[in-house]
């Protein structure tokens, strides 16, 4: 079914967003919250969500980028009759935070316009500040996802009342490094035009989203937007209960900062204050665990585009040494073997016992803002199975050395810890953007369920 032509004046659209964002009452919502399967691409280890875009909704695969500011899509192949550009020097231009203004491009296509706002397609697998950055027009167009009700029933993307979303165009060359079939990115970060914030503004959804990345090679996990729960997984277990909570911290220096202009990061940080291995605290340089307000370095970031947790060199050395020592002691009694890249600590698989929570290994505890708030990393998340055909079959500690304060941009420093996708798998994460806190479960495998157990039944509607 073709969508009606988008005729909403852009200035009105801005005030519509602004009014809804400031409305205190959220009792009335418009339609059920959003849900998407999260597929893991085996070759790139990237996580992929599904959305529906354009005037005649097309299923679109997007990279799940937890820290990105907004959606972007390859517009070289974008065929929609309903899109609109955002004019420069308007209130909406300021609200969106456009990078610049595109002038004198008069071809009739989404990637071209005269005096229109442009954004930067954010591809985390292409280097930033390379001197060859591309910008592309911002668009307003239809965007939808699957929906889910409180019983867990799945509905199809609505053709009668789709979302009107702001996002960025991109070009084919911006897809370099992305998984096959992916045509853009789904940004969930701290931004006025991220998916959860736009969905909340338009439809009065609570400013919540949740991720449950699957540890299965074949079955997807699930992403939820606009609901506090319940989140019904296998055996009808609601993963919103119980959760531990820790504040989401703002890094005041984002990757697009300059010496004379600091822009806050769109990425999510949490306050890890110590690390324990097998119940014993690891000696760390505490200054590395805090965010430096001057250059944004340090602290702990969450990332869905990093496959394995990255630790600053001194932290990595301390944690791995403590882990090897604990694994060598009773009741584990394990001896390391030749490592397999990119890991440095591995054990013969034949010597490792397994439970439903994964291989039996020393627990790694990330202690948050209070000593009783702990993200416990068990064997299913601390270890990675590497079985080479005709070669090694080992369990490896799934953490990597990030170097000594590496830089991702010219002016902003890197975090000391980046919690990667593998460590999040089969952990339920709820992002409460109203109270700016993270709810987390630790591994749900110990509860007899998994992130792959959410049922994406036949679509309706």
Task: Label each residue range with its predicted role.
Residues 16-33:
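N-terminal signal peptide
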Residues 87-88, 199-200, 454-459:
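Extended Gly/Ser/Thr-rich low-complexity repeat segments
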Residues 42-181:
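Signature of the N-terminal lobe/flap region of pepsin-like aspartyl proteases
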Residues 79-103, 236-246, 318-340:
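Cytochrome P450 catalytic domain signature, combining two hallmark sequence patches
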Residues 128-137, 141-267, 301, 366, ...:
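Glycine-rich flap/beta-hairpin and adjacent strands of clan AA aspartyl proteases
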Residues 3-8, 20, 24, 43-46, ...:
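Aspartic protease catalytic domain
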Residues 9-14:
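Sec-dependent N-terminal signal peptides
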Residues 30-35, 117-128, 194, 255-257, ...:
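Short Pro/Gly-enriched beta-strand edge/turn motifs at strand-loop
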């Amino acid at each position: 079914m073709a969508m009606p032509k988008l005729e909403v004046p852009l200035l009105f659209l801005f005030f519509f967003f602004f009014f809804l964002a400031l409305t205190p009452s959220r009792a009335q919502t418009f339609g059920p919250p959003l849900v998407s399967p999260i597929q893991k691409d085996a070759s790139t280890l990237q996580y992929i969500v599904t959305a529906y875009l354009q005037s005649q909704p097309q299923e679109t695969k997007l990279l799940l980028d937890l820290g990105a500011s907004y959606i972007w899509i390859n517009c070289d192949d974008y065929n929609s009759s309903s899109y609109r550009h955002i004019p420069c020097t308007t209130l909406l231009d300021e609200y969106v935070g456009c990078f610049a203004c595109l002038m004198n491009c008069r071809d009739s296509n989404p990637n071209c316009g005269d005096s229109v706002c442009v954004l930067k397609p954010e591809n985390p697998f292409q280097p930033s500040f390379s001197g060859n950055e591309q910008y592309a027009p911002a668009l307003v167009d239809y965007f939808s996802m699957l929906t889910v009700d409180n019983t867990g029933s799945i509905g199809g993307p609505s053709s009668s009342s789709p979302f009107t979303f702001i996002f960025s165009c991109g070009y084919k060359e911006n897809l370099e490094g992305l998984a096959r079939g992916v045509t853009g990115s789904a940004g969930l970060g701290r931004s006025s035009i991220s998916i959860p914030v736009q969905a909340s503004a338009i439809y009065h959804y609570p400013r919540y989203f949740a991720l449950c990345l699957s540890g299965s090679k074949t079955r997807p996990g699930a992403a939820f937007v606009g609901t506090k729960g319940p989140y019904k997984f296998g055996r009808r277990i609601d993963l919103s209960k119980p959760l531990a909570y820790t504040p989401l911290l703002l890094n005041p220096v984002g990757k697009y900062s300059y010496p004379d202009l600091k822009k806050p990061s769109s990425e999510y940080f949490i306050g890890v204050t110590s690390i324990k291995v097998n119940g014993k605290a690891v000696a760390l340089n505490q200054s590395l665990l805090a965010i430096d307000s001057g250059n944004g370095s340090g602290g702990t970031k969450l990332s869905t585009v990093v496959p394995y947790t990255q630790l600053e060199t001194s932290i990595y050395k301390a944690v791995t040494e403590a882990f090897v020592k604990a694994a060598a002691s009773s009741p584990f009694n394990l001896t390391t073997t030749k490592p397999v890249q990119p890991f440095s600590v591995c054990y013969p698989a034949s010597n490792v016992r397994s439970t439903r929570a994964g291989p039996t290994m020393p627990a790694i505890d990330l202690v948050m803002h209070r000593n009783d708030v702990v993200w416990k990393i068990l064997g299913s998340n601390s270890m990675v199975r590497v079985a080479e055909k005709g070669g090694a079959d080992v369990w490896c500690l799934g953490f990597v050395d990030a170097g000594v304060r590496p830089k991702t941009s010219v002016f902003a420093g890197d975090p000391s810890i980046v919690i990667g996708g593998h460590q999040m798998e089969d952990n339920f994460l709820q992002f409460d953007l109203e109270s700016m806190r993270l709810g987390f479960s630790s591994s749900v495998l110990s509860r007899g369920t998994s992130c792959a157990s959410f049922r994406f039944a036949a679509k309706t509607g």
